[in-house]
């Protein structure tokens, strides 16, 4: 999906532009989290996202992307990713994933931010849902920690697959501790970002034998 282009290396100044876009995305997340509640429609959440982007003086990199009709993806329960906002009314206990992005322009160049989060609407519907949500968050932080540790060591012998290794390790350990095994979605991957929203490298959420 994202091609086989080389990884785009950024300068410190370019990273600052990306941070500006990322801060707008963080503001979108905050606005969405404040709006999520039983009775709210996913279309209303899209309106919240659009206002946050406008307030941040940025532009949506979701709206119009390959014809996508909204500024946020709202995936509820069984919807894994890329759910389109509409008249679906959120119910207590729903698990909701919100994926959104924004870009800023500097010297005629777009710099993109893109991030997702999962929230429970009201209260968890079951202990299983709670276990899924909490384990997924633990896996996220384990992957971030693995990258941070690699950075501190100067990226010596570091490989992109350490992210998938960290995620799968958390999922495996959780299954060993509780006896409840969770699956990892392999049909979708993470991605690089920069002057485009989707760039190299593809980032797998599971362990692979090859290094890279």
Where are these regions (language model features)?
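Active-site neighborhoods and metal-handling regions in enzymes and metal-associated proteins
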Residues: 1-212
